[in-house]
Every structure is written in structure tokens, then in C-alpha cells.
Amino acid sequence: VKKIHFLYTLPFLFFLSCKNEKKDSIAETKVPEISQVEKTDSLVTARIDSAQVPTALKYKGNFKDGFRWKDKTGEYVVVTSETGVYINENFTHENDGSDAEVFAQCYSLENNQQIWKVNDFIKDCMVDIDAAFKKNSLSVTDLDKNGVAEIWAMYEMACKGDVSPSDLKIIMYEGKQKFAMRGETKIRTGMESHGKPVFEGGSYTFDKAFKKGPKAFRDYAEKLWSKNMGE
């Protein structure tokens, strides 16, 4: 079955989903409890739950995970969300199939501007749909110690009616620079005659940004991949 999915990343000036100016101040939201805060030499981060998402930050679907952080460029919040399987009336449907979307949105807490947005989706799928972030894969780091945070999100996408790997992706942003790692989940497909399990998938490729970026980025990405590539 052919897998159909698309990926959009929108810069902060492109407000397809945020056409109306928000009156609420994102910075007025409740600050996470101090026990949740992690500090390094260049970064202060705190995982947030759905109740701590600023009221001015509107997201589609169900809250999955979130972080608030401060680096040398300012203070920010990121939220990941999933729609689950549904029908998006804005999509073209030729097969009377279903849709599913995942979102990651980063906002500045200083001026309420959207810094970047990731929207990946499956559309018009007649079989099983998988569009979900990997649990606890959202993270905020400063691996190159330059004072600018790296934001990591990992998710899988599939439209399939058989036992086969799903598409797997890691999207990372440092400021407005996007890095992408793409491949497949690793699944067990059977057993050899002497009892050894047989696996399929698990491979990946780095985009140009990752290849040209610091080795620390690739090392972290590979560890994240190895930890979460199973279905």
C-alpha cells in the first residue's frame, strides 16, 4: 500500500494557522514549578503539561508534550500535538479515506511570534494510519554550547495494511535552522530456523544540515533513533 504523507515547515512570519493577532500575552502563563527546571551553563529548561500551555498559543489536536526554555536569544515555548485519525475537510479525498496530523510549534515568549512550525500528515488513507510522536522524545539541548537551544522532536507516520516498517523522522531546530533525519522503524518480521529473530527497517539518512553540522548533533540524533526506532 502506498504511503502518502507530506511535511510542511513554516517560518515565523507565515501565519496560516494564526491569522488573528492574539491579545493574550504568552509570557503571562504560569511558570513551571522550580522542581521541574533544569539548568546548564547556557540553558534553563522546564517540561510543561497541557495546563501550563500559554492561553495565547493555539494548537490543533491533542496536547502531546511541551517545553519552556531560556537561552541567550530569549525565552520560548514549544508544544507538540496530534489529531489522531479524523477527516480534514481541507484535504482532497479521492478514496473516501481518513487523515491524521502531527504538529510542533515554537513561540517566542517575548513578542508572541511563531518562530517555526512543523506539520506532517497522512491523508486519504483507506487502511491503518499511524501519525504520532515518540513518547518523551521531545527535548531541549545545547550540545554545541553556543547558547542557542536545539529543539528535538521524533515521530512516525504510516498508511499501511500490512506488517511493514513505518516512516520515522527526527526534526531538530537550532534557532530557525532546520535539521532532519529520516528513515524507517525497525520491526520484527519472523524467526530463523535456529530461533534467531528477523528484523526489517531501522535505517536512516541525515539531511545536508545534519551532515554539515556539529558531530554532537549527529551523535545525539543516532542515540535518540536507536532508543525509539521500534514500533
Where are the language model's segments positioned?
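C-terminal motif of bacterial Sec signal peptides marking the signal peptidase cleavage site
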Residues: F15-S17
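Acidic, divalent-cation-chelating loop motifs in proteins
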Residues: L138-N146
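Acidic/hydrophobic-patterned starts of short beta strands in beta-sheet-rich repeat architectures
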Residues: E75-T80, K145-Y155
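Beta-propeller blade signature
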Residues: A100-S108, D167-G175
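Short consensus segments that form the blades of beta-propeller domains
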Residues: I87-S98, V127-D130, A158-S164
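Acidic, small-residue rich beta-repeat scaffolds with periodic aromatic anchors
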Residues: E21-T73, L168, Y173-E231
